[in-house]
């Protein structure tokens, strides 16, 4: 059976500060760095060997991927980066403290923005300091593709082509795959993999640690699902 390991990035500096992060390129905290290393140790203990690895273009996921691969003695494994694995874009909430946002907009509204499948948060202004429209890493993309806000539905729509073009074919080819990504991009792909309803995915949480493992048969039916070390 082939294995797919999802590793959400370790705790970031903005996770620690309780800020909405989205596409802001925030670094790992000291705790997050250790979580990434520990993820790699769990992978090594489980004897999982990878053939391919994928991550986003955000440093917290890139560093988590590299640290986990290094700790599992697999730093040589080819890593492909894609914006399609980025975190959900939190729009105008980016950089805001979650508790302060709840005070400003109300607990219920913020909960809907965070957990609903298809409700968009407020859009980010294109002149915002965190706008991806002026970020060089997205210069090759058509401007209309770069989001100003995303919900989980839109996140899945932009992540799904990468699943279909890269990850799924590798798994069907018998290759074990590592994906270092983000809470919501992983949630979106888990929804697709498990065929969850829009309501069911609302209750799914992806922790910073430990990694989540899926085992598939040759037709990519899920045979088992578990967290390493549990």
From Swiss-Prot:
Pathway: Carbohydrate degradation; glycolysis; pyruvate from D-glyceraldehyde 3-phosphate: step 3/5
Catalytic activity line of the entry: (2R)-2-phosphoglycerate = (2R)-3-phosphoglycerate
Active site (UniProt): 9 (tele-phosphohistidine intermediate), 87 (proton donor/acceptor)
GO molecular function, a single term: phosphoglycerate mutase activity
Residues the record lists as binding substrate: 8-15, 21-22, 60, 87-90, 98, 114-115, 183-184
Stored CDD domains: HP_PGM_like
A Pfam short name: His_Phos_1
Sites marked Transition state stabilizer: 182
InterPro entries named in the record: His_Pase_superF_clade-1, His_PPase_superfam, Phosphogly_mut1
Top EC class, one word: isomerase
Family: Belongs to the phosphoglycerate mutase family. BPG-dependent PGAM subfamily.
Protein name: 2,3-bisphosphoglycerate-dependent phosphoglycerate mutase
UniProt source species: Streptococcus thermophilus (strain ATCC BAA-250 / LMG 18311)
């Amino acid at each position: 059976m082939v294995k797919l390991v999802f590793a959400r990035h370790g705790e970031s500096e903005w996770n620690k500060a309780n800020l909405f992060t989205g596409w802001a390129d925030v670094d790992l905290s000291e705790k997050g760095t250790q979580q990434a290393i520990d993820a790699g140790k769990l992978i090594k203990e489980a004897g999982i060997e990878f053939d391919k690895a994928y991550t986003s273009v955000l440093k917290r996921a890139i560093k988590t991927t590299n640290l986990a691969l290094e700790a599992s003695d697999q730093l040589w494994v080819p890593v492909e980066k894609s914006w399609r694995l980025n975190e959900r874009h939190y729009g105008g909430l980016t950089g805001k403290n979650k508790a302060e946002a709840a005070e400003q907009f109300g607990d219920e509204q913020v909960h809907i923005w965070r957990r609903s499948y298809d409700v968009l948060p407020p859009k980010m202004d294109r002149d915002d300091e965190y706008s991806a429209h002026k970020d060089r890493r997205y210069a090759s993309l058509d401007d209309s593709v770069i989001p100003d806000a995303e919900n989980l539905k839109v996140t899945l729509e932009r992540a799904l082509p990468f699943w279909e073009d890269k990850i799924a074919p590798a798994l069907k080819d018998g290759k074990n795959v590592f994906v270092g990504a983000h809470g919501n991009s992983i949630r979106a792909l888990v929804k697709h993999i498990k065929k969850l309803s829009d309501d069911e995915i609302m209750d799914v949480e992806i922790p910073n640690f430990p990694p989540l493992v899926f085992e598939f048969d040759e037709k990519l039916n899920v045979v088992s699902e578990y967290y390493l070390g549990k």
